[in-house]
Amino acid sequence: MLLKTKHFGEINIDESKIIEFKDGIPGFENLKRYVVLYDGDKNSPFRWLQNVDDGELAFAVVNPFMVVKDYDFEIPDEAVESLGIESILDVMVLSIVVVPEDISKMTMNLKAPVIINTKNNKGMQVVLDTDRYSVRHYIIEELRRQEVNVGAGSDEKEK
Amino acid sequence: MLVLTRKKNESIIINDNIEITVVDVQGEQVRIGINAPKSISIYRKEIYLEIQAENKKAAEIKNVDLKEDLKDFLK
């Protein structure tokens, strides 16, 4: 189907890739269908969580494990149950990113990750019951530290 | 809002599958136990509101090219 996207204009998406968020996500409870878009570089930790029913709604998201190497949590029972998760191999985890005017202050939400069961394309945002992770975790320092390949077009380093 | 008075160890039942029990009362603090189906999401309200606000902020994202914009920071 043709999908209007916030950042990529009108694109053709495979309907079987649509992820159902039964309860939406907090703040956008009525919008329930999303797709994950890559901008062509699978090595980059960034993706877009694009809403299907409202083209103007798209979140920048990251694969948190590519940014925070020791990020670790147990998937809450409520997610295992409502997403019907059978194997950890089917699970995709994304952190929603806030990109302010000053991009150096970009943060990711480690406290409330988006969990997707890629087997049945069901997703939800969960809230971790821990004080270990913050809703506003600064990204730039992490990226610098980890030397993550963000696809920033930097010269390839010699191994 | 419906207001009920409960003592320690007393419960209320909602919709025949959610049980809320007053576990302990110490001055200003009340400990509450909740028995509910696993698929029900339960949040501390202030945290839920914080997540909502954060998501709304995230949705205000302008048309950025993260790759380009991050270049300068990761040299």
UniProtKB/Swiss-Prot annotation, chain A:
Write one Pfam family the protein is assigned to.
FliW
Provide one Gene Ontology cellular component: cytoplasm
Which superkingdom heads the taxonomic lineage of this protein's source? Bacteria
Please state the protein's primary subcellular location: cytoplasm
Alphabetical UniProt keywords: Bacterial flagellum biogenesis, Chaperone, Cytoplasm, Translation regulation
Q: Which SUPFAM superfamilies match?
A: BH3618-like
Q: Does Zinc count among this protein's keywords?
A: no
Output one GO BP term. Answer: bacterial-type flagellum assembly
Q: Where in the cell is it found?
A: Cytoplasm
Q: Which Gene3D superfamilies match?
A: BH3618-like (2.30.290.10)
Function, as annotated: Acts as an anti-CsrA protein, binds CsrA and prevents it from repressing translation of its target genes, one of which is flagellin. Binds to flagellin and participates in the assembly of the flagellum.
What does the similarity note say? Belongs to the FliW family.
Subunit = Interacts with translational regulator CsrA and flagellin(s).
Q: Tell me the protein's name.
A: Flagellar assembly factor FliW
In which organism is this protein found? Acetivibrio thermocellus (strain ATCC 27405 / DSM 1237 / JCM 9322 / NBRC 103400 / NCIMB 10682 / NRRL B-4536 / VPI 7372)
**Gene, per the UniProt record:** fliW
